[in-house]
Amino acid sequence: MAHRILRDHEADGWERSDFPIICESCLGDNPYVRMTKANYDKECKICTRPFTVFRWRPGRDARYKKTEICQTCCKLKNVCQVCLLDLEYGLPVQVRDTALNISTHDSIPKSDVNREYFAEEHDRKARAGLDYESSFGKMRPNDTILKLQRTTPYYKRNRAHVCSFFIRGECTRGAECPYRHEMPETGELSQQNIKDRYYGVNDPVAMKLLGKAGEMGTLESPDDESIKTLYVGGLNSRILEQDIRDQFYAHGEIESIRILADKACAFVTYTSREGAEKAAQELSNRLVINGQRLKLTWGRPKPDQDGANQQGGVAHSGLLPRAVISQQHNQPPPMQQYYMHPPPANQDKPYYPSMDPQRMGAVISTQEAGGSSTENNGASSSSYMMPPHQSYPPPPYGYMPSPYQQQYPPNHHHQPSPMQHYAPPPAAYPYPQQPGPGSRPAPSPTAVSAISPDSAPAGSGAPSGSSQQAPDVSTATGSSQ
């Protein structure tokens, strides 16, 4: 062609754009995305014309993604430039066309010349301001679309590819390898072709989804005619009571709507059984509120309130489990074991022996002791129970106990008067002290004991230590005799 030789980009139909047409799953969950743009970098895999390629990383653990087809082919099928799924429902082209009864297999030519001419005609209409876009979004979805459509992004699709060296056992990168160290999945889903996905022919993913839609059954009504309540599960904070009422009111008059926020569910009760059956038939497997797919089933009848209250009241009235107490509710209680204290009557909490404040080592107040403070002759209001200081039987196996002074601390209730002095026994000095050079010899114990305290002169110049030590020794000696 002459315009190909002139290299006129606009006349040749080469695409030049500023932003790609992609779905939310391919864009990723990161609000700050850095894209690189390369004009006329690759050729479209459908029409084989050069186009602008965008490349970015959807997330931290995702692989780099890039556009695969041009925007002209993307607008003809209303699909994403990367994954080639429908932009509105997130389904393959074959599933969407089958559900909406659209035959687009022969509308787009497949030969090189006819395909290029077809694309140039659509580009010419777009430059002229004519509406050439498809009417896929203008059609009303049917039951199959509502059952299979994706309401939330699927970011797992952006994971890295499987490492081929890891499959052969030759990967030396270890944890630093940017690819997944997993075994690949084999089967029909692993054999996919981008052209079959675009034209909607022999797509294994579409075959699986269509088979799943055929297996979905309707919601069967329960045999109990008194049940008029429907259970709605999978709620979130964005769904309000008015949203649920607007969705269910078209099928019958609603008696009440009860929302349990902590359990993310709601119960819709109709005034008649016919309204509940109609809502279950119309909304089964296709209940979507505010973009959130919800689960719809029949509600169960409430349990007996009297039996539940009686069982709950018996559950906390003793030490035995609930099952044993319920069995013994109409029977006399068995005899208590010898090592178990019988629980007091009419108690709300269990009783254990360790809860008795009269046990050894517990702090007993004046009121709990019951007049014990009067017997102690002005003792403190609370005291620790100490073991009595008395003789104990000898321990077995020839164990020699420690001296009495080391067993228990001295009793501080009776303090000695300041005038009383206790001298060490004579056994504390087994040997006489040797006089050193230039010191006076110490008097013998007999000489000290013979001297009377009254015979010592009042104004003598004896050292204070010797004059005070003699009366102490004599007192101790006299008391020992």
Curated annotation (Swiss-Prot):
Gene Ontology molecular-function annotations: DNA binding; mRNA binding; zinc ion binding
GO biological process: defense response to bacterium
Record-linked SMART domains: RRM (SM00360), ZnF_C3H1 (SM00356)
Chain intervals for the UniProt region annotation (Disordered): 329-481
Domain RRM: from-to ranges: 228-301
Keyword Cell membrane among UniProt keywords: no
Biased composition (Pro residues): 331-345, 423-444
GO CC terms: nucleus
Record PROSITE patterns: RRM (PS50102), ZF_C3H1 (PS50103)
Keywords of the record: DNA-binding, Metal-binding, RNA-binding, Zinc, Zinc-finger
SUPFAM superfamilies: CCCH zinc finger, RNA-binding domain, RBD
Comp. bias (Low complexity): 369-389, 399-410, 449-471
Name used for this protein in its record: Zinc finger CCCH domain-containing protein 4
